[in-house]
Amino acid sequence: MKRWLLAAACGVVALGLLLYPLVGELLSEKYHSDIEISYTAAIEDTDDAELTAQRQAAQQYNAMLANATISEGGASAPPLAYAEQLTVGGAMCYVDIPKINVYLPVQHGTGAETLEKSVGHVVGTSLPVGGESTHAVLSAHSGMASSKLFSDIDQLEKVDTF
């Protein structure tokens, strides 16, 4: 009887280990889908004047960042508060890389909680709104069992767009 219980317990543990990556990826996709729905609804519910104001504030932030001095620790912080930029819908934007089937939300910062579930925007780099002399730096994990994120980024080439 004890051997049977031990064998069953080992089987359950083995099954759990085998299913963990699949279940983790499904939960991650559900999380990203929920954020996309929320983000899209928030954008649609926000009037054009507010969206324009958010974009202009982000462009002003980028302009100040372009003129900031660089020290050993990175760019000096511009006067506008980073966390107040691009705040509609809980995500800053989305990164879309069709070649590797990636469409992920971009969150403020690169803390552990952010990078566990999504792409993080590196503080001190341009906000992802485009423009001259702007270079937004994004960060995400690759090779995680619980989420794909940037796992296939090594398949990209210099000519690929995103």
What are these regions (language model features)?
Residues 4, 10-161:
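Solvent-exposed, non-transmembrane regions of membrane-associated and secreted proteins
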